[in-house]
């Protein structure tokens, strides 16, 4: 088994709000990965005294512990429990009903021995890639936000009306009920040669800049590693800035990648 992990802040002046980790049981069989992309709130009050990095670390750590200690629980249940536990930690000090309370996108994967399935869960716009033994790559996506008309997301206020709301998009915040909206499933272990989890700061190599396909993206990870893909993203971002003086998107975003060959 080969596992690589890398993460990079979008700016040295701001804390990295992405979070990534992997757990490998002492038995030597199986494992779990968690990748979170913390949602950066606009300036102003968002009801919490802790902040997004605190939230992603709390939620991520709880997810990792539950993923390997509650093997019989489906990942949707693991996520619901982790959201509830994290909310309980600051329920008495923060306004968890605020629409901008700290929240994150989620990618989870868990695998056992050769006869067991690879389980997956994706909530919001991070991505999980599954590679078959033949080399085909399947992207597991929760594309709700991409299907929304751009004009509905043009302002923070209009996006807030769609956040964790029917007809909009969902993130892991304080309501464990959002887990019913996650994209979850199972794949026979024998049909998964490798997997990769990417926040949108890394997946923009494919989705925004169209530098390659998902299959080519996984090929970069295999040859150059997780940091190699992030380095490619940073190079493309810089080149894009040099070509134009008008940037309509965040130049550098936090990026996190986990790559695992099973």
Language model region names:
Residues 1-262:
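PP2C/PPM-type serine/threonine phosphatase catalytic domain
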């Amino acid at each position: 088994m080969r596992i690589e992990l890398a993460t990079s802040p979008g700016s040295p002046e701001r804390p990295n709000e992405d979070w990534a980790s992997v757990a490998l049981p002492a038995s030597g069989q199986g494992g779990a990965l968690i990748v979170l992309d913390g949602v950066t709130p606009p300036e102003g009050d968002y009801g919490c005294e802790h902040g997004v990095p605190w939230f992603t670390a709390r939620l991520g750590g709880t997810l990792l512990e539950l993923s390997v200690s509650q093997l019989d629980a489906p990942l949707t249940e693991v996520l619901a429990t982790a959201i509830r536990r994290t909310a309980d930690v600051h329920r008495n000090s923060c306004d968890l009903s605020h629409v901008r309370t700290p929240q994150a996108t989620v990618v989870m994967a868990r695998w056992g021995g050769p006869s067991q399935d690879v389980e997956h869960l994706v909530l919001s716009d991070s991505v999980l890639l599954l590679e078959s033994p033949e080399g085909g790559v399947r992207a597991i996506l929760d594309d709700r936000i991409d299907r929304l008309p751009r004009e509905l997301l043009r302002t923070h206020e209009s996006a807030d009306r769609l956040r964790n709301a029917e007809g909009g998009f969902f993130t892991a915040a304080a309501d464990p009920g959002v887990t019913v909206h996650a994209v979850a499933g199972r794949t026979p272990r024998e049909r998964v040669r490798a997997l990769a989890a990417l926040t949108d700061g890394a997946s923009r190599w494919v989705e925004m800049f169209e530098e390659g396909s998902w299959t080519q993206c996984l090929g970069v990870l295999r040859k150059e590693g997780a940091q190699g893909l992030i380095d490619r993203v940073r190079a493309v971002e810089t080149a894009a800035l040099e070509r134009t003086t008008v940037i309509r998107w965040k130049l550098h975003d936090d990026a996190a990648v986990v790559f695992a060959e099973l």
